[in-house]
Amino acid sequence: CLAAYLEPLVEANLVPLILTSDPAVASVAPYGGLDRVYTPNPLAIGIPGREQPMLIDVSMSTITNGTVGKTHAAGGKLDHPAILTGHGEISDDPEDYFASPEGSILPLGELAFGHKGFALGLMVEALTSALSGFGRKDAPEGWGASVMVMVIDPARFGGTESFLDETDHVARRCLDSRP
């Protein structure tokens, strides 16, 4: 959903970066742990390009809170095991998230590479809640996102044209990659 905010800035050849967390909610376990500590902590970045911009909007967890809630309400199973049960087993059943002891969502990268998603989740926590001075330590109630927005002007660095040359080159290499 954060990607919707990127387009006007990208159209102006700016690079927006948006990070957000909700300090009132904990749903994702840290790598190697079972307990819920932070939220999926999405980040979005817009990368201008002459042909087509790149809009990236990803969470630092394997799935989102919304996916767990909607799948649970529908009585279904997740597409893949993304829940860590309260007993430390992985599961595709959202019921395990709501069970006692409560389950948690695995960080991006799951069990094998979850340390990477966990590290990125911590980065989002630091740049949102910690920088704002209002976070999990304050035990907030209700919805209250901590957000960090950064807008980078390539003209202030190596220049807009050079930036677009590079982003177009990388995008073209990706699109031309063999399937």
What are these regions (language model features)?
Residues 14-18, 43-44, 52-55, 81-83, ...:
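Structural motif
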Residues 26-98:
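Phosphate/diphosphate-binding glycine-rich loops and adjacent basic-rich segments that engage nucleotide
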Residues 13-27, 125-143:
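Glycine-rich phosphate/pyrophosphate-binding loops
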Residues 76-136:
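Secondary-shell segments that build the walls of catalytic and ion/ligand-binding clefts
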Residues 1-3, 28:
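Short glycine/serine/threonine-rich phosphate/pyrophosphate-binding segments
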Residues 4, 40, 103, 114-125, ...:
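Conserved active-site and cofactor/substrate-binding residues in soluble primary-metabolism enzymes
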Residues 6-8:
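N-terminal intrinsically disordered, cationic/polar leader segments
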Residues 126, 137-179:
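Catalytic-core signal marking the mid-to-C-terminal active-site face
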